[in-house]
A protein has these predicted regions:
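A short acidic, helix-capping loop that chelates divalent metal ions and anchors anionic groups
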Residues: 43-48, 81-86, 121-128, 197-198, ...
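Well-ordered, non-membrane alpha-helical segments in soluble/globular domains
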Residues: 55-58, 138-141, 274
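N-terminal small/glycine-rich loop or linker at the start of catalytic domains
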Residues: 1-10, 73-84, 120-126
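Hydrophobic residues in well-ordered beta-strands that form the structural core
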Residues: 36-37, 74, 114-115, 158, ...
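Active-site acidic/histidine proton-transfer and metal-coordination neighborhood
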Residues: 18-24, 64-67, 82-187, 197
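Histidine-acidic metal/acid-base catalytic patches
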Residues: 1-33, 66, 95, 99, ...
Length: 288
């Protein structure tokens, strides 16, 4: 069976943080091989710590995961909502944080670093006349970031987005960008729920389109054209069809959830719901 993973991001209803130092032990107990370590919020720990204290924090996380038999399979790099990439100084600040997170990724001994495209004209540039500028700003930014990633031996995983009027959002657009970058350290994070936001896209078909370029995944479901990060089977995705597509392309990575049991549940209910989440994921990939 394909290995399972799950995010540590509390903003997508992940309540594993309640377990404190035993978080990774709980992940292992529930059947997870790996985790998606969240470094998206640059206004919180470890970004707010000194370099020395940040390294100590990251090393503790790494060792707790290792002791529990859990692999930090991927790291989610900086992301802010609403996007603020409009000015050169905004993008310079992003670059500084992105490079810091790459260093953090290296301390965690993680080789997969997930990031979003820059949105210098906001989330709706299609039809504005700014599409090519959006692409060129991203090319310039990502080339510099890629050079830093290669220094650490880390692969940048460029994520498809749920913005229907943004020019670097669909799997097709992400694939074109990655192919233009033309580097084995620049690959794709397939976000299943983001594909589901587009009414006219079929996840299985898009998975086959991306094929060998898929390095990591964000797995969740959506409905009503919204990015809700719901559990599989709670939205519009055909999960058996998606599983077949993964088998067809020979994907051998981690089936990593970007959803989870509601964090507000009392402990006893959360335990049961969290196990159910893992069971749902395991059922989807049981033949892979």
């Amino acid at each position: 069976m394909m290995r399972l993973g799950i995010t540590t991001d509390s903003r997508v209803q992940n309540g594993y943080g309640r377990y404190g130092a035993d978080t990774y032990k709980k992940l292992a107990e529930h059947g997870y091989f790996g985790t998606d370590f969240n470094l998206s919020n640059t206004e919180t720990v470890p970004y707010t710590l000194s370099r020395e204290d940040a390294e100590a924090f990251l090393l503790r996380e790494r060792e707790m995961a290792r002791a529990a038999g859990v692999t930090i399979w991927q790291v989610h790099g900086p992301w802010r909502w609403a996007p603020r990439d409009f000015l050169p100084e905004d993008r310079a600040e992003r670059m500084e944080k992105m490079k810091w997170a790459l260093w953090a990724c290296s301390v965690l001994e993680c080789k997969n670093y997930v990031i979003h495209p820059l949105m210098p004209y906001g989330i709706e540039d299609i039809g504005s006349g700014n599409e090519e500028s959006t692409w060129e700003i991203n090319r310039t930014f990502m080339r510099e970031l890629l050079a830093e990633a290669k220094r650490y031996g880390i692969t940048i995983c460029f994520e498809n987005m749920p913005m229907r009027k943004f020019s670097i959002a669909t799997p097709e657009a992400i694939l074109r960008f990655v192919q233009e970058m033309d580097d084995e350290n620049f690959r794709i994070c397939l976000d299943t729920g983001h594909v589901a936001v587009f009414w006219d896209l079929d996840l299985a078909e898009e998975t086959r389109r991306l094929g060998k370029y898929i390095r990591v995944m964000h797995v969740h479901d959506n409905r009503n054209g919204l990015d809700l990060h719901q559990l599989p089977f709670d939205g519009v995705i055909d999960w058996p069809s998606f599983a077949k597509a993964l088998k067809d392309i020979g994907f051998d990575g981690v089936f990593s959830l970007e959803c989870g049991a509601p964090g507000k549940l009392p402990d006893a209910l959360f335990e049961r719901a969290a196990r159910l989440c893992a069971d749902i994921a395991a059922d989807i990939v049981r033949d892979l």
